[in-house]
Amino acid sequence: MFIKAENISKVFQDRSLPVTALKAVSVDIEEGSFTVLCGPSGSGKTTLLNLLGCLDRPSGGRVFLRGEEISALSQEKLTRYRLRKIGFVFPDFNLIPTLSAVENVEYVLWLQGISGTERRKRAAAICERFGIGALIHRRPRELSRGQQQRVAVARAIVHKPELVLGDELTSNLDHKTGSELMGFLKELNREEKMTFIYATHDPVMIERAGRVIRMQDGEVVSDEKTRVHA
Amino acid sequence: MFLFKLAFLNITRNVRRSLITVMAVGVGLAALIFLWGFNDGTIEQMRENVIRLFTGHVQIHARGFEKSLSPELFLAQREKVLIDVAANPAVSRITERVKCEALVGTSENSRGVLLVGVDPERERQITDLEDHIEAGRYLEPDGNREILVGDRLAKKIGLDLDDKVVVMTQAMDGTLAGYAYRVKGIFHTGSQQIDEVSVYITLASAQELLGLGEDVHEIVIQLSDRKGIEPFLEWAKISLGSEKYEVLKWNELIPEVDQWTQWAEAVIGTILIAVMVVIGVSIMNTVLMSIYERTRELGVMMAIGTSPSQIVQLILLETLILEGLGIILGLVGGYLVTIYFGEVGISFHGVEEAFSRSYMSTVVFTKVEWPHVVQSVITLILLTSFIGLYPAWKASRMEPVKAIYYS
Ligand SMILES: Nc1ncnc2c1ncn2[C@@H]1O[C@H](COP(=O)(O)OP(=O)(O)OP(=O)(O)O)[C@@H](O)[C@H]1O
Ligand SMILES: [Mg+2]
């Protein structure tokens, strides 16, 4: 099993009131799968995604990645884990505004200690592949939302992570752009064997996933594999 | 390089705020440099004033004379000492003096004074008493019945030019000796000590009064350079022998200048710390604001694998760049202003009295003393780096999830 979550729960302390975002959720994610988390707002999609992505630690339960219990690792180790194995796409893209498109992508490679020339070559190549090769020297605010989203995805996958997590990936994109992006992701999923997990409200994305996990009030209410169609 | 670039780009985000911070550092440092320059200039002039006014660089006495002023403690083997000293290449000028406690009296008043017998010709080459004569004139070489008195003393005992005074003192043989002199000049040096307590007659008449013959109490030496004082003292210790003579440098004779220096440096040290705190708080404020404004961005950076220590490095680097630019600005600005007033001088003619009492000049020429500049810069770097640690540490402690979703 690639990722295994065992009875994970998450309680946030909102001022003095405890908020239970996740109640004893157990899920297994297979390597190379293309999974969607859906459900109403506040159902715990983001929380689950962050726990699977080592971004946060559960209040209860355990998370394993390839059999290693990541929920027990130190903050420093988790950081390194995320850097090597995981790619993130955050809502609203969250690019670094002072850096150009290609530098945003390069940043991850710099964190991995890859040298300057190699870095620029790889970052530019990914941007090219995402159809933004001509725009790589623009700052994020000089790009359209669709273009920014591509940069965000390029940043998430440039270091060839095993797992890519996306939160509200297409929520601010028009139908056509969102659909195009999905095409890219499916391609990567097939070719690079990257495992993808997304949280979304978007029916188009849900439709194209290989597996749909529905959540409500911090619980998984349904989990079905669909026939994958590209 | 990437980190440096990122830090630099972050600084240029809010150009105005960064500029204000750089200015705060720059102006603060420039002010400190100027303040040191002012103090160092003042003290340098005080040193020269004291040396020129009275002490010369070094004085040689019989051991114990400076404290006791006993008339019988004249310099043994005066001629040999004179020849030896004159042969030292560092020595540029020499004069001799007789010094004793005496009583100066008119028909109505009398007062205890320090009677100084000087060789008018040689004295004027070392000290500038002559320039301070306000009324009348300086001593004639053979003016053996002439006396110079300070303006304060003249006022106290009611003396005027050409008045007659009687000077009485204990002679070598223990008897009471007394002569009448005519006031030929009244001086004003600004030093209360000298103006109120010292009177000058010629060396020859003082020797006669005390029955000293050719002997003197004091040899005053001017070296070609003040830096030569310490080596000269070393030389004197060996060549003259320390058991018979005391060889004193100017700042042992007038310790007030050194005391003043210490005091002023302590005051500036305090100001230094205050300025540092202001600069530090200003930098901290800027950096904290800039962190607060990009909480989400920093959260994302951490989420995608930036380690807390890299965040610390980034924020510290931003602090250091701001500070570095400020230091460059402050160094250049402070240096130029200090150099400028070193040429032009800052006049304090309005408060002359207060200044001259402590041997200060009324026009201060500022002076750049590099050790003080370096000290200011190093303190600035240390203190503000230390202060910069706090925002950096705070940024690195952020939880990525909270930063990204709840800010
Ligand atoms: N850091 C936090 N502090 C307090 N409460 C939190 C925190 N994070 C999440 N919650 C709460 O936990 C619950 C689940 O939130 P979560 O963000 O996982 O929902 P979601 O399914 O992603 O919703 P949406 O579709 O709106 O993004 C919500 O009630 C939310 O208010
Ligand atoms: Mg969410």
Which residue ranges define each predicted feature?
Chain A
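A short acidic/small-residue loop/turn micro-motif
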Residues: 227-229
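H-loop (His-switch) and adjacent beta-strand-loop-beta switch element
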Residues: 212-225
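ABC family nucleotide-binding domain
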Residues: 2-208, 212-215
